[in-house]
Regions:
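Short, contiguous, pocket-lining structural segments
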Residues: 60-62, 140-144, 153
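Short, surface-exposed beta-strand/loop "edge" segments at domain boundaries and coil↔beta transitions
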Residues: 36-46, 91-99, 121-130, 169, ...
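Ligand-recognition surfaces built from glycine- and aromatic
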Residues: 63-65, 77-81, 172-211
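N-terminal entry module detector
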Residues: 1-17, 182-186, 211
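Short strand-turn-strand beta-turns centered on an Asx-Gly dipeptide
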Residues: 162-167
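Short, aromatic/His-centered strand-loop micro-motif at the edge of beta-sheets
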Residues: 116-149
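Short tryptophan-centered beta-strand motifs in secreted/extracellular beta-sheet-rich domains
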Residues: 68, 145-154, 159-161
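Secretory/extracellular carbohydrate-interaction modules
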Residues: 8-117
Length: 211
């Protein structure tokens, strides 16, 4: 199917790396699946991914939020590990001088649970062992067929995660995360372990809203 013009206008998202949408009966669900994502390759490694990326970028100054609803179908939910929404700092140089996006908050389906993983620094993945593991916030069980609504909210450097309207936890970014760096939101499937691409997964997204 084709994505509707109204959804394109209202969502403030552009598509990248994926080829399939469904919008049956004007429900405005967007389908993202392995059969779409296997056409792309992440520059961060060999993992396939699909994504909707925010067009405009924002800084931690002020209040910003990203809300979306999703459900899915997974052939092995107890083993699959993938990101289904996140925000990143845009194009910060690494030790080699190459500009790289830095994930600060990921919402992941992780072996039957939904978790938030938060980095309180900009370091690249390869040096995480030096700087410590991300902060992990458990958001409850992941039942693929059940609709789940996630809200990621920032108020200056205070980050709060909501699930289905319930506040789960807040953390405050340290001085290592700067207020004036530009950030952006993404939604999609980003596999987090080598076995997940062999597990059939499809996610349906709707009501994507940035404020």
């Amino acid at each position: 199917g084709m994505i509707t013009a109204s959804l394109v206008q209202n969502s403030n998202f552009k598509n990248k790396y994926f080829s399939k949408y469904t919008d049956k009966n004007n429900t405005d669900w967007i389908r993202i699946s392995l059969d779409a994502s296997d056409q792309g390759k992440s520059p961060n490694g060999s993992s396939v991914r699909v994504e909707l990326a925010q067009k405009t970028k924002w800084a931690l100054k002020g209040t910003h939020s990203f809300t979306y609803t999703f459900f899915g179908n997974c052939s092995n939910a107890s083993e699959a590990k993938f990101t289904v929404g996140q925000f990143l700092a845009s194009k910060l140089p690494n030790a080699n001088g190459k500009a790289t996006d830095r994930p600060l908050c990921r919402i992941e389906a992780e072996q039957g649970k939904i978790v938030a993983k938060i980095r309180n620094y900009y370091e690249a993945d390869k040096v995480d062992e030096i700087n410590g593991d991300p902060i992990k916030i458990e958001l409850g069980a992941w039942i693929p067929s059940k609709e789940t609504t996630i809200k990621i909210q920032t108020e200056d450097k205070k980050l709060t995660i909501f699930r289905d309207g319930e506040k789960k936890e807040s953390i405050t970014f340290t001085e290592k995360v700067l207020s004036d760096e530009r950030n952006y939101f993404k939604a999609g499937i980003y596999y987090q372990n080598k076995d997940s691409p062999q597990i059939f997964t499809e996610i349906f997204l709707k009501n994507l809203k940035i404020e």
